[in-house]
């Protein structure tokens, strides 16, 4: 079942078709020191963002159950496996900071982890990093360029934030290369995937 929650016109799902690679394969010489630091930070992104603002918000774009695609599959989450997809935007003081997409295998949503299927506007990271069993097994990075759906989303959000004008005017906002990261976590020995893309006004680019 598809559930779209965010209260402005964004088509769900956004999806993320990135060129994911391990940090060791990324040429960091072209990236700023702050961006590299945010990309490689092993702590809670939610907690770090909260330290930079007075008002932290999660706005849910949508949620739906679907088969895992080949592009997002891994050793622990197989192609075709039923997953709950959740897409959100993280805001700091009304500035869109991060687009996040999580894949939660339905098989992982058992026991205490059932709470992950009913987060609402509660940040996923807050739940994950409060659990001492959490392990990050893999971290991958990817740039996102002009033909990416997340860059198109960023242009709309930037237009809305900059002038509160109708989103149809978003085409006048210059697009930029964005960077994101994707992590495979184990929570109570149950796998899940979280991808986070830093939006144009993110602290990571400052």
Curated annotation (Swiss-Prot):
Coiled coil: none annotated. Substrate binds at residues 86, 124, 196. GO terms for molecular function: chorismate lyase activity. It catalyses: chorismate = 4-hydroxybenzoate + pyruvate. It is an enzyme of class 4 (lyase). The keyword Lyase applies. The keyword Cytoplasm applies. InterPro entries: Chorismate--pyruvate_lyase, Chorismate_lyase_/UTRA_dom_sf. Its main location: cytoplasm. Keywords: Cytoplasm, Lyase, Pyruvate, Ubiquinone biosynthesis. GO terms for cellular component: cytosol. Its EC number is 4.1.3.40. It is found in: Cytoplasm. Pathway: Cofactor biosynthesis; ubiquinone biosynthesis. Removes the pyruvyl group from chorismate, with concomitant aromatization of the ring, to provide 4-hydroxybenzoate (4HB) for the ubiquinone pathway. Belongs to the UbiC family. This is Probable chorismate pyruvate-lyase. The gene is ubiC.
């Amino acid at each position: 079942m598809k559930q779209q929650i965010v209260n402005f016109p964004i088509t769900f799902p956004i999806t993320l078709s990135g060129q994911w690679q391990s940090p060791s394969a990324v040429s960091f010489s072209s990236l700023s020191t702050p961006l590299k630091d945010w990309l490689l930070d092993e702590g809670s992104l939610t907690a770090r963002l909260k330290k930079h603002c007075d008002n932290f918000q999660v706005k849910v774009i949508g949620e739906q159950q679907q088969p895992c695609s080949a592009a997002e599959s891994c050793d622990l989450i197989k192609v075709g496996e039923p997953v709950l997809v959740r897409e959100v935007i993280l805001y700091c003081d009304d500035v869109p900071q991060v687009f996040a997409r999580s894949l939660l295998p339905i098989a992982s949503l058992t026991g205490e982890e059932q709470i992950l299927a009913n987060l609402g506007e509660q940040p996923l990271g807050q739940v994950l990093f409060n659990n001492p069993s959490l392990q990050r097994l893999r971290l991958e990075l990817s740039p996102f360029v002009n033909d990416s759906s997340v860059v198109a989303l960023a242009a709309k959000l930037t237009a809305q934030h900059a002038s509160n004008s109708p989103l149809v005017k978003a085409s006048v906002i210059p697009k930029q290369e964005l960077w994101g990261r994707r992590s495979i976590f184990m929570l109570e020995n149950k796998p899940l995937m979280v991808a986070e893309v830093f939006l144009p006004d993110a602290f990571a680019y400052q």
